Amino acid sequence: MGQIYRRAEQYLDQLDPECIGQFVEIGTSRNGDDGSTPTIAGWAKRFDRRLWTVDIDPDNCDFVCRMNLDNVEIVNQSGEEFLKKFPAHNNSISFLYLDNFDWDWHPEKPEDFVLEQKQRYRMLGQDMTNLNSQRAHLAQIVAATLALGKQCLVVCDDTWYNRWWGHYSGKSGAAIPYLLNLGFTVLETEEQPVYGTILGRGIG
């Protein structure tokens, strides 16, 4: 919904270029969205690194494939399954963007476009609920634990600190406490208009 990932660029120069790892995006760009994949691919190229962009929807993967980005590896898989195997690539992750498994902003009365999303998820064998969104994001972070570098940025889309309740809401609401236990700190979080949170370890 927001473009929190754009704010992460300001922290990239704090990554040690001598030991920087790979860039990973869970949830590729899709037709009509904010264009995160080419932007993050450009950042990765600046450090002579590749971007691994992962999406469970083959249509989204095909959309990114047509961009012909020369330093991007496109993986049609769930984020959880990909991240379980990532350490086998012998690379650490220095930048992880979680922008997958959509959030239903009005579950009591979903908008028409959300109903269309839910139908697409069912076609892919998924049940699009907010609980399942949080479960997926937590599973992804748990799977990525061993691969996350000593210096690392994690950007969580559609996730914000709820000041009324004193906890994190949105997609990665369950994942942020886990990241804090891994030594990450919240660099910034905002509700409207960007609805996102950036965490870092070994940053600042």
Listing of model-derived features with the role each one plays in the protein:
Residues M1-G204:
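A short alpha-helical cap/connector motif
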